[in-house]
Structure formats: structure tokens, C-alpha cells
Amino acid sequence: CILLQTRADDKYALAEEMNSFYKHQLNINTWGGPLNILECTPKGVHKAFALEYLLNVMNIDKQNLIAFGDEHNDQEMLSFAGKGYAMKNANPALLPFADEQLPLTNEEDGVAQFLQERFL
């Protein structure tokens, strides 16, 4: 994975342009809020890829996996998990990939609150 911080006014347009050029070799996603981060990974390598590997090694069914996300680079992970949750501050493009949207943001400790309410 390579992370690039860009000065581009529109990181989404830049990512789209780069994806069209490198579409057979790389996945290019955006994240970082105001930081304008582009995440470049080899085609087919993403968070769900890593989670699938770990689940296989640990002999855990993916239905027992919950995932939390807020940006484009979380799409595959939320789709892959048994339950995928988008944060309140999630990029709207991520919402179709989530089973549910949490009522709190990252900054409001939304994941910790969710885990405490559900499991403690």
C-alpha cells in the first residue's frame, strides 16, 4: 500500500483519473478528510482481502466478523463482514455497503460506544 497526500483541489476527481489510467494494475481510493490522501494498492488487495486471510488462519466464520468504516477504502471490508457498520461521519458513498449507520462519529468514540452497548 502506498499513501499519497495531494494538493489537488478535488481528490475524488484525481483518484478517478488515476484509476482510469492504472485500472488494470491498481486500486486507488481516497480518505483522510481534509488531508487529501490517495491510497494505492495492487488490484484485488484491500482490507477484506486481509481479513479473509486472518479469518482462515484463525478458523473463524466471517459471519462472526463485524467491521466499522467511514471512507471509500472500507467498501469491500463492510461488504465482506458478517455485519458492516458505517460511522455517522461516513462518506455518503460508503452507506450502500453498510448494514447500518451508527449514530456517533469516530470523534465521538462511536465504535467504543457500540461495542460497550452490545457486548458489555
Residue ranges, per PLM feature:
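Conserved acidic, metal-coordinating active-site core of Asp-based
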Residues: 1-66, 72-75
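Mg2+-dependent phosphoryl-transfer enzymes with acidic/Ser/Thr/Gly-rich catalytic loops
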Residues: 41-120
